[in-house]
Amino acid sequence: MEQRRKRSREALYLTNTPTTIAELAFADRMQIAFFDKATQNRLSFSGHESFQCRSLWLKKGYDFVNTGHSFTDEDAVVELGVGKNMVNAIRFWMKAFGLTYENDKPTPLANKLLNDIDGWDPYLEDEGTSWLLHYQLITASRASTYGLIFNGLRRDKIEFTKAHFLNYARRQAEIRGESVNDNTVKSDFDVFVRMYYRADTQTKERDEGLTGLLTDLNLMRPLRRKKEKEDDLHFVIENTEKSSLPDAILLYGILANRQFDLSVNFNTLLTEPDQAGIRELSFKSIPDSMTVLAKYYAR
């Protein structure tokens, strides 16, 4: 296992040239544009059947569609070995992470990441892959809660609760001329929490691969207060430096952003709104990041 982990880490973060990363990043730009057109950038808080994405689902989903199957096939339940609701959930998360198109065909990123023959990290063993998926989840805009929280809510409130998010989602929907179902939004927030926060009671679930896919990033934690009910629990998103973020993932996040051209001000990455896909990677200190840019662009 350790040898395989080392191989995937080298393949993903050491041997990829800037050209390879750039090609994939610009393909991702077009992919996000396609998703925006397909969804008309509408808010979405459902589709996951109340299941957070589990550790093996993306690989399972990729292997399924990469052999020509579709999640709408009659035998999808049998082939995937899960119930109908979980089939729907796997399909949702594949799209939410930007790994499949509307027709269930794999995207370029999915092929680069999950292919058994030459995929960078087919079994999602490296923490750097989790950072990449975190970026994808926010920027693919298929699961609105993640962008709303990382791009907006945490700017309004350092600490936030489910009720805070519900009110924020209502305001954002009103701005867009849309409406939201309160129960759906609250359920989606619960899934968001399980995606990023692993409670002590979930130790057994972790051993069985049932915890949220991004809990190891330790991006979010609860603030415990006496006599606080579960729905009133306050959360905070950490703003600490993350040494586990590989240089290549930072570069990918910058190049894949459609708002950037041939150059970008570094302060923009840190302070401008709507840069959550990059800024919320919580990347390393400024000197390290500048070194990264010089390393890749000076060639």
Describe these PLM feature segments:
Residues 26-299:
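Donor-sugar nucleotide-binding helix/loop cap in glycosyltransferases
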Residues 11-20:
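Polybasic, low-complexity terminal segments and linkers that are predominantly intrinsically disordered
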Residues 3-7:
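Cationic, low-complexity basic patches in intrinsically disordered or flexible, solvent-exposed regions
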